[in-house]
Design a protein with these regions (language model features):
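Active-site-adjacent pocket scaffolds in enzyme catalytic domains
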Residues: 111-112, 118-216
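Metal-dependent polysaccharide deacetylase catalytic core of the NodB/CE4 family, i.e.
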Residues: 46-127, 139, 144-151, 172, ...
Length: 282
């Protein structure tokens, strides 16, 4: 069973942990290339192609990174333009942000960009209109709906496997692929990326993804900054210190373990030819 390997291409100072204003970004050291280098080395070593969701901001500042990803045969998706949560934007602001990222990525790659992931999984019940906007912009795939809730994001009763969302009574021509979770009865446990991947032991991650793979393809995700152990260590509240910095040194090893143990490919390759249900989210 093949799984999707995804990377959200943002720098350490873009994260919602810090929530720095855009006007301050130029004050911080660009380090996105360090994590990308490590990720590409792993993918090359195991001959795996992945899907990179790239911020428009990063693409404009580091066009050479986008070109390198394309030259190596990886798939490019949009992560929005300025790492704004959908929940902080109205419909027109969101459309403008996504369109800007799509334009720069298509210019750099020479390819149609038809895959999207929101920042911090911020397509939630009150921002379902964002899926209609993505369809208007000719996106065909999305990975923004998290099938569990956190203070910032999530959809309590969302499907845990790929589906076509029904919004306002209409099935969208947009395939949604949620991040993988391990079912626990009616509940579920995230394990496949971010802090969850850094906190959980390899044995549990292996067990959880094998359980998903009994019936479905899974999806894992990471960020370049999660492999960058030399990034600046800011004085932040304890909960932010934990969510952002905890166990960064384990990320590369766990990703390599997954690449050794499971099969991976790009988003579009994994979902190609599948039959997926249409589901109305409530």
């Amino acid at each position: 069973m093949k799984n999707v390997f995804t990377i959200d291409v943002e720098d350490w100072f873009h994260t919602m942990d810090f929530n720095f204003p855009v006007s301050s970004w130029s004050n911080y050291e660009d380090r996105v290339h360090h994590g990308i280098k490590d990720i590409l080395e792993l993918l090359d070593k195991y001959n795996v192609k992945a899907t990179f969701f790239v911020l428009g901001y990063v693409a404009r500042k580091h066009p050479e990174l986008v070109r390198e990803l394309i030259n190596k045969g990886h798939e490019i998706g949009s992560h929005g333009d300025m790492h704004k949560m959908v929940t902080t934007q109205n419909r027109e602001e969101f459309k403008k942000d996504v369109a800007a990222s799509k334009e720069i990525l298509e210019d750099l790659t020479g390819k149609k960009i038809n895959i999207y992931r929101s920042s911090s999984w911020s397509i939630v019940p009150k921002t379902m209109w964002a899926l209609e906007v993505l369809e208007e912009l000719s996106f065909e795939y999305d990975s923004s709906i998290q099938p569990f809730t956190t203070p910032l994001s999530g959809f309590k009763n969302a499907p845990r496997t790929p589906f076509y969302p029904v919004v306002n009574g209409r099935r969208l021509n947009l395939l949604e692929f949620p991040p993988s979770v391990m079912p626990l009865g009616k509940a579920c446990l995230p394990f496949c990326g971010g802090l969850y991947l850094r906190v959980l032991p390899k044995s549990f991650i292996n067990y959880a993804l094998n359980k998903v793979n009994k019936n479905n393809s899974g999806m894992i995700y990471t960020h370049p900054w999660e492999l960058d152990v030399k990034q600046p260590r800011l004085k932040v509240p304890p909960h932010i210190k934990f969510t952002h910095y905890y166990n960064l040194s384990s990320t590369k090893d766990k990703l390599e373990y997954l690449l050794q143990t499971f099969e991976f490919d790009t988003f579009s390759k994994v979902v190609e030819g599948g039959a997926y249900p249409s589901i109305e989210l409530k």
